[in-house]
């Protein structure tokens, strides 16, 4: 079972690309991903389409990154690389970053950048968050691949939502990010160095849900746990997969201040009813916590409630979180998992 959600804040101007969901049945390999074109850094007009609509650098960048990720995965399948983190050679892991760098380098400006635009401006800036996986009879092996502050997660009936990526940002703490907007320290672009971080995950028991989301979903809620509450609240009220997608779409549109996209695949559940029933107890626990939220107009009470809610939620949420990047790795534009620069 799989679904994608895509909404745009301004009709016709959405800078998130469509979510990516691909599964190759013969090898049981798949990839899902989201791509958030960064409208602030990439607000310059890149081109006009056949209807005369202006498209920004951010709009073009997210679509390019999606295309690059799709073609990278298709190339892996065409080469019959049945991927498994326990057996595959480490150099395979560099392919997505190299693929993105090759594509974006093809549109890198050749002239000197004007001093007027400032250091914040980027040519074709976008985030990438993807999960590459191989499903097996009783577990799934996956790796997270990302640049920027879009996120990848795993959701299980027992442990709930757990982050598989750590934002490339000045302040990676997910609670503080809800009240401030830290600067990103890494993003895909055509005119600056970037890296795609890789984090392999061994056997994750089935059943589970793998998902990727842009910050339009998780960046406009009261606490980090509210995103999981949105996921499970809509799930438990849905009759089937299409209904769940529709409820997610309408719910995120009601609270977000940004474009929002999500890609999700449920593995090991025989039916939608089994998925919904499996998450019912977890949702009941989350709902009890959410129902205790004070009036948001009471700033002090709200601050204390948020801190307490995060204290309860944090251990499970961060149980699989990768360690922070070393400062020298960040400054050099590479990690121990994926080397190279643009």
Question: Where are each of the predicted segments found?
Answer:
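Short beta-strand-to-coil "C-cap" segments at the C-terminal boundary of structured domains/repeats
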Residues: 22, 133-134, 155-157, 264-271
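N-terminal entry segment of metal-dependent catalytic domains or homologous docking segments
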Residues: 1-71, 150
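Short glycine- and acidic-rich boundary segments immediately preceding or forming the N-terminal edge
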Residues: 1-26, 98-119, 137-138, 165-181, ...
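Glycine- and acidic-residue-rich phosphate-binding/metal-coordinating active-site segment common to enzymes
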Residues: 156-194
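C-terminal catalytic subdomain
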Residues: 190-342
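Catalytic core of PPM/PP2C metal-dependent serine/threonine phosphatase domains
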Residues: 80-157, 184-206
């Amino acid at each position: 079972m799989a679904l994608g959600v895509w909404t745009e804040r301004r009709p016709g101007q959405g800078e998130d690309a469509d979510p990516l969901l691909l599964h190759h049945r013969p090898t049981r390999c798949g990839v899902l991903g989201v791509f958030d074109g960064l409208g602030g850094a990439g607000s310059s007009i890149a081109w006009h389409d056949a209807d005369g609509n202006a498209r920004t650098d951010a709009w073009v960048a997210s679509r390019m990154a999606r295309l690059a990720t799709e073609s990278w995965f298709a190339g892996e399948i065409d080469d019959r690389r049945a991927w498994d983190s326990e057996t595959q050679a480490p150099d395979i892991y560099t392919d997505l970053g190299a693929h993105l760098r090759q594509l974006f380098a093809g549109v890198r400006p050749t002239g000197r950048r004007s001093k007027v635009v400032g250091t914040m401006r980027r040519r074709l800036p976008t985030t990438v968050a993807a999960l590459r996986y191989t499903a097996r009879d009783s577990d799934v092996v996956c790796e997270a691949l990302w640049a920027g502050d879009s996120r990848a997660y795993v959701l299980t009936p027992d442990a709930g939502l757990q982050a598989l990526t750590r934002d490339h940002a000045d302040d990676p703490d997910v609670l503080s990010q809800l009240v401030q907007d830290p600067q990103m320290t890494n993003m895909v672009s055509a005119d600056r160095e970037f890296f795609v971080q890789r984090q392999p995950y061994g056997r994750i028991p089935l059943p589970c849900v793998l998902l990727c989301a842009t910050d339009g979903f998780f960046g406009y809620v009261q606490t980090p746990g509210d995103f999981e509450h949105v996921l499970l609240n809509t799930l438990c009220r849905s009759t089937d997969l299409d209904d769940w997608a529709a409820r997610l779409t309408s719910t995120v549109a009601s609270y977000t201040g940004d474009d929002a996209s999500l890609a999700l695949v449920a593995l090991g559940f025989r039916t939608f009813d089994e998925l919904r029933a499996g998450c019912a107890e977890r949702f009941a626990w989350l709902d009890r916590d959410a129902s205790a939220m004070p009036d948001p107009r009471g700033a002090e009470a709200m601050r204390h409630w948020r801190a307490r809610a995060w204290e309860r939620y944090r251990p499970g949420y961060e149980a699989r979180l990768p360690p922070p990047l070393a400062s020298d790795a960040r400054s050099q534009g590479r990690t121990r998992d994926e080397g190279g620069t643009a």
